[in-house]
Amino acid sequence: MTALDTDTPTAGRSAPLISPGPVIPPPDFGPLDRAQGWAMTAIITALAAITRFLNLGSPTDAGTPIFDEKHYAPQAWQVLHNDGVEDNPGYGLVVHPPVGKQLIAIGEWLFGYNGLGWRFSGAVCGVIIVMLVTRIARRISRSTLVGAIAGLLIIADGVSFVSSRTALLDVFLVMFAVAAFACLMVDRDQVRERMYHAFLDGRIAETRWGTRLGVRWWRFGAGVLLGLACATKWSGLYFVLFFGVMTLVFDAIARKQYHVPHPWRGMLRRDLGPAAYVFGLIPFAVYLASYAPWFASETAVNRYEVGRSIGPDSILPIPDALRSLWHYTHAAYRFHSNLTNADGNHHPWESKPWTWPMSLRPVLYAIDNQDVPGCGAQSCVKAVMLVGTPAMWFIAVPVLGWALWRTVVRRDWRYGAVLVGYMAGFLPWFADIDRQMYFFYATVMAPFLVLAIALILGDILYKPNQNPERRTLGLLTVCFYVALVITNFAWMYPILTGLPISQTTWNLQIWLPSWR
């Protein structure tokens, strides 16, 4: 429904025509070209699988894991052979929750303790991330073409690519966070569809709080996925908080758009309780469930700490197993809290979060420049570096600025949602600047950067009231940019995969002094 034009004079009419009812948003609840959308998604996903799985088992460090794979690949192997738990290191400590290592163990179960085995699950998750980004971009832009563009961009992102091909935990965190975001985008559309039908049925004004929205299974799924994110790395908690606030704001805005008398109080009355359940109880339950092998173990780290370092009595009737898990969690937290520069913890490839948006300080995962054949008398260089594709990451600041402007000035919810996801992976790290940090913490920011760029390209393609010449120019601009990103990715491919290159080429690949 739309308001009739009240500014145009009409002969024989002494008063302006007014709308017979309140104006509500048009019934747009998602893309309609399902067949084309899934066909496009299948093609993009197949391309992602080729890039993520090609020569996946290489490189290794003389048959052993590289960089921090040295922590997680062995721990996953222990999980596989110790009934789901890592070896108890005695004086050491296992400092991350179990889900990521449980997933790595699946690949090791299938292919053995080798490069393919410990990287297989991460590559599968990398392909799923590409599919999710493609579907999210298509849904929020209402354009299958924009979805395809986003898919190509995430395929060609160096950070997403390398993280998918190494046995670190971040790729699993990214998959769960992005999947939760995808669920919430579907939930947003479903809420508006329910509000629309409630408006047509006259149920909006039944109370001043507005109608109840019923069971929201997509939001429930988001809660489960966020619990898995927290059970991979604790930084998943940031997404629980940011996404929880985001969905409540979406609910309040929907109630306002459909003329609920008190939309914000209606959100607090109708939506806050269910949201607290989904973003509080469900993730916590999933997190505890991920420790089921730990609870069942007799030898897991700190499993029977009650009665040893902590007393047998408790003020609250909490089971000893949960008290032991709390002690274990606190010990791991203390480890992370003390991993600071002030305490003498330094690493040649550490970085601070203000360098992450533009990939100013990447991480060198592996390098071999001694007696590598293929470059004549001089040794070749084989290296794997986690670095963002410059054609995307170097423009991050203006992209984020534009997204903020669209959110605040134009009230464009799409950019606002993407900013929430990006900032959930970025802002919390400023709370403890002295902590030792690395660029791979920014892996979870990459999909949201890609989504923001894809939305901008979509706005260039579909700018309203364009004449044919401007439409053609916009199409050429978008094609040129996507080709530039793919070319940039192809140029950097050797240092993303460990292919041998000459010393001269290596120096050409290192664009900034801070990359050394």
Curated annotation (Swiss-Prot):
The keyword Aminoacyl-tRNA synthetase does not apply. It comes from the Bacteria. One of its GO terms (cellular component) is plasma membrane. It is an enzyme of class 2 (transferase). InterPro entries: GlyclTrfase_39-like (IPR027005), Glyco_trans_39/83 (IPR003342), PMT_4TMC (IPR032421). Its EC number is 2.4.1.-. GO terms for molecular function: dolichyl-phosphate-mannose-protein mannosyltransferase activity. The keyword Cell membrane applies. Disruption phenotype: Not essential. There is no significant difference in growth between the wild type and the insertion mutant. Inactivation of the gene has little effect on metabolism or cell wall permeability to drugs. In contrast, tolerance to cell wall stress induced by the SDS detergent is slightly reduced in the mutant. Deletion of the gene leads to the loss of protein O-mannosylation. The mutant phenotype is unaffected by the lack of manno-proteins. Pfam families: PMT, PMT_4TMC. Keywords: Cell membrane, Glycosyltransferase, Membrane, Transferase, Transmembrane, Transmembrane helix. Pathway: Protein modification; protein glycosylation. It is found in: Cell membrane. The chain crosses the membrane at residues 113-133, 143-163, 166-186, 234-254, 275-295, 384-404, 413-433, 437-457, 473-493. It is a multi-pass membrane protein. Protein O-mannosyltransferase that catalyzes the transfer of a single mannose residue from a polyprenol phospho-mannosyl lipidic donor to the hydroxyl group of selected serine and threonine residues in acceptor proteins. Belongs to the glycosyltransferase 39 family. This is Polyprenol-phosphate-mannose--protein mannosyltransferase. It comes from Mycolicibacterium smegmatis (strain ATCC 700084 / mc(2)155) (Mycobacterium smegmatis).
